[in-house]
């Protein structure tokens, strides 16, 4: 199963579960709880809100020296990515260790081409990531940063961490 197919299937299962919870189909006593309860109110997507992507390069200082056969390093170049939508913010980062062959410049050039303002619904994860993948071949660090930030944003909107959305055990 491809990663995209898995994400699409997981999204449909999550959406279906949310419908059942919202109607009281599986979980009783949860529908209509105010914030502060165990299950947050679902976020309503719509209106004129648009996603906005921004990024900032920085040098990540490693807590411990990282060593491979040919060298050691105490820092790594990094680019932090933010996707903002209707007062919510998702974060991702592109880490570029030397052996990946990507640079801060190449990541920033790629991210400068990404225009998420054409999307009004961050839950269109597959459509958004297909668009991002189609911009250039390669640029995997930059694409991963957008992917991570988008998933973080959707988790923020749902009020849940992804391990819980996917039904995983936090331990």
Regions found by a protein language model. Give the residues of each.
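N-terminal export signals
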Residues: 5-28
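C-terminal segment of N-terminal export signals and the immediately downstream linker at the start
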Residues: 22-62
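Metal- or metallocofactor-binding catalytic centers and their adjacent structured scaffolds
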Residues: 40-55, 83-84, 89-158
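Glycine-rich, charged/polar anion/phosphate-binding loops
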Residues: 65-68, 162
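Short Gly/Pro-enriched turn/cap motifs at secondary-structure boundaries
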Residues: 69-74, 138
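Conserved N-terminal beta1-alpha1 strand-loop-helix module at the mouth
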Residues: 74-80, 156
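Metal-dependent enolase-superfamily TIM-barrel catalytic cores that perform enediolate-based chemistry
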Residues: 164-171
